[in-house]
């Protein structure tokens, strides 16, 4: 029976993206899943977490895998369908802004990672996470500093999360014009700050973020002060449902209830 930790092995980052995963497979700890998030630093839009399991053999089709932040948009879009085609399993979880507000971004991120791993159709023998430990997983795991540039499965998860979130933010621009979501994807940029100053925040902004609250106060936008602790209004729930329907083609799990509960009411749209 595989142990919880592999024997001590020297892994050099320069050895390639598959070196760490290969060492785990050789020691009987596969399949190996990578998990990563996108949107942690954004002040609008969801936090998106993806988990991905790649097979033990290197695929030439995925040779360009790297940290999604280092890849251009065209390259990410090219890799996105290839990862979904060749991965043994993948699962993407969207955590909406009101849930990030309610739980806090770090706790929401950890819970999203747990759900992404739990949603895989193939049970991993080991999980590699990008940067920090994910407590509460049912299988052994290891945080990898700079993981999306050091392990192919994390890099693949990073691309899945990034492309899925970017596509949603383009959809969000159509629902909330004037903010430039299609361009800055909800991150804090001069253009986004200027839009907040002009219009005040919309329901997709994260009111637990200081810049969003200040913009709301400066523009007189009414916002529920208890949003940071509970979910938004029924109007927000309706908008969330509209966005959820737009996500059906992405094969994701849309978290529509507190993420700390495993029996949360989720609209599950496949796991790849």
UniProtKB/Swiss-Prot annotation:
EC nos: 3.1.26.4
Cofactor: Mn(2+); Mg(2+)
Residue stretches in coiled coil: none
Pfam families (UniProt xref): RNase_HII
Domain RNase H type-2: residue ranges: 30-221
Domain of life according to the entry: Bacteria
Primary location: cytoplasm
Keywords: Cytoplasm, Endonuclease, Hydrolase, Manganese, Metal-binding, Nuclease
Catalyzed reaction equations: Endonucleolytic cleavage to 5'-phosphomonoester
GO molecular function terms noted in the UniProt entry: manganese ion binding; RNA binding; RNA-DNA hybrid ribonuclease activity
Comment on bound cofactor: Manganese or magnesium. Binds 1 divalent metal ion per monomer in the absence of substrate. May bind a second metal ion after substrate binding.
Protein family per UniProt: Belongs to the RNase HII family.
Name used for this protein in its record: Ribonuclease HII
Species this chain originates from: Mycolicibacterium smegmatis (strain ATCC 700084 / mc(2)155) (Mycobacterium smegmatis)
Protein encoded by which gene: rnhB
């Amino acid at each position: 029976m595989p142990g919880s930790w592999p024997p001590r092995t020297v892994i050099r980052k320069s050895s390639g993206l598959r070196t760490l995963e290969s060492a785990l497979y050789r020691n009987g700890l596969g399949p190996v899943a990578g998990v990563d998030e996108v949107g942690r630093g954004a002040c609008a839009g969801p936090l998106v977490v993806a988990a991905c399991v790649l097979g033990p053999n290197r695929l030439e089709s995925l040779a360009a895998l790297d940290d999604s932040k280092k890849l251009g948009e065209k390259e990410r879009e090219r890799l996105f369908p290839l990862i979904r085609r060749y991965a043994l399993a993948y699962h993407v979880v969207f955590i909406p802004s009101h849930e990030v507000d309610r739980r806090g971004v770090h706790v929401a991120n950890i819970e999203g990672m747990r759900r992404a791993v739990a949603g895989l159709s193939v049970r991993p023998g080991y999980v590699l996470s990008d940067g920090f430990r994910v407590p509460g997983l049912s299988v052994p795991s290891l945080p990898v500093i700079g993981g999306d540039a050091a392990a192919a499965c994390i890099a693949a998860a990073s691309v899945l999360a990034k492309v899925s979130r970017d596509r949603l933010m383009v959809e969000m621009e159509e629902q909330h014009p004037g903010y430039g979501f299609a361009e800055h994807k909800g991150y804090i940029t001069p253009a986004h700050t200027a839009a907040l100053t002009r219009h005040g925040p919309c329901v997709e902004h994260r009111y637990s973020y200081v810049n969003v609250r200040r913009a709301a106060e400066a523009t007189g936008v009414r916002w529920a002060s208890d949003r940071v602790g509970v979910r938004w209004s029924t109007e927000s729930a309706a908008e969330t449902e509209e966005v959820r329907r737009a996500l059906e083609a992405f094969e994701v799990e849309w978290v529509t209830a507190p993420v700390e509960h495993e029996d949360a009411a989720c609209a599950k749209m496949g796991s790849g």
